[in-house]
């Protein structure tokens, strides 16, 4: 009998040191993310809100916490009024891992270039987003950032 066992592509380590395998995740989350990024580029707050889970949490690189979809939409509304951020997706990896309660978590890890204007000057940053999906909605995003290399 041949068992259909997912191939591990990495390891997740919890805060208390518990290890679990990271395996290939649900590829459908890629199209959800593409719709989400397009909505950001189009300043379509209604679509963004429809993809956010009600209990959305965002962890931007500056150390703040965006708690709840309504707070996320308020944050974006102000940002979009003050600037014109644009994201270009460079790569996406669908992956999943089991949490300490034994629940399978669906993640999408993505690489984006963010072009924005700061004090009238255009900047480009590299972002990595770790995105947690629950029931087709985005429940949490961790954003990591570095300045784009000048070569």
Predicted regions and their residues:
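Acidic helix-start/capping segments at beta-turn-to-alpha-helix junctions
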Residues: 52, 63-68, 90-99
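Hydrophobic pocket/interface hotspot
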Residues: 36, 47-49, 56, 68, ...
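Short beta-strand segments enriched in hydrophobic/aromatic residues
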Residues: 52, 112-116, 145
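Surface-exposed, charged secondary-structure patches
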Residues: 75-119
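Short beta-strand edge/turn micro-motifs at domain boundaries
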Residues: 1-11, 124-151
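Sec-exported extracytoplasmic/periplasmic mature domains
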Residues: 37-42, 50-57, 61, 77-85
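Short, low-complexity N-terminal intrinsically disordered segments enriched in polar/charged residues
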Residues: 1-46, 50
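A short gly/proline-enriched turn/hairpin at secondary-structure junctions
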Residues: 18-23, 57-67, 82
């Amino acid at each position: 009998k041949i068992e259909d066992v997912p191939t591990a592509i990495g390891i997740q380590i919890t805060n208390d040191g518990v290890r679990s395998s990271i395996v290939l995740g649900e590829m459908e989350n890629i199209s959800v993310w593409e719709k989400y990024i397009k909505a950001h580029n189009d300043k379509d707050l209604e679509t963004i809100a429809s993809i956010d889970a009600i209990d959305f949490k965002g962890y931007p690189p500056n150390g703040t916490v965006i708690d709840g979809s309504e707070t996320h939409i308020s944050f974006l509304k102000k940002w979009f009024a003050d600037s014109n951020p644009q994201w270009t997706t460079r790569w996406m990896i669908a992956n999943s891992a089991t949490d300490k309660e034994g629940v399978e978590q669906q993640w999408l890890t993505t690489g984006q270039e963010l072009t924005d204007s700061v004090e009238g000057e255009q900047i480009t940053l590299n972002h990595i987003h770790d995105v947690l999906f629950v029931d087709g909605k985005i429940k949490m995003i961790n954003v990591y950032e570095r300045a784009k290399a000048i070569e």
